[in-house]
Amino acid sequence: VFTAERYKGNPLAVVFGADALSDDEMQMIAIEFNLSETIFLSAPEHVSHSAAVRIFTPGGELPFAGHPTVGASIALAERQHGEDADIDMVTVLAEKIGPVRCAVKLKPGAASFAEFDLPKLSRRSEEVIAREKLADALGISPSEIGFENHVPTIWSAGVPFAMIPLRNLAVAEK
């Protein structure tokens, strides 16, 4: 998210004071920003939380995303302590998947740092992915997908993603 080098970061919109915004307004703002994610911060409902958050892409709401979690936590730390602060602190963001604890380090003249703990681990879905459909989408042969006991699977810790093992590195280079 953040970097000490110009044009090297990953843009993120962080909207403070979103308590009065409706779902539709948040979605329209995310569409207007047209970034990969926009995170909206509201007053927390629980005293141990730093903020309640909602994460939107131009296409819809996400229950969790790492990029905005890190960005919002650093923005909260900078807002609370100033951009030139030299601190280590912890934020707790109330996200759709549950409370997300995020450790933040701010150092003057250096890129900010944050890391988080997920409230739940990724789980494998029972859904089966047809190799033919994957192969067609990837422009490869179905026989180039999977090897030994490694087969395509879907996982999720809030946002589903596919794990697609390829037969070898040459397939990935196509």
Where on the chain are the PLM-derived regions?
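Active-site proximal loop and beta-alpha junction motif in alpha/beta enzyme cores
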Residues: V1-A65, V70-K174
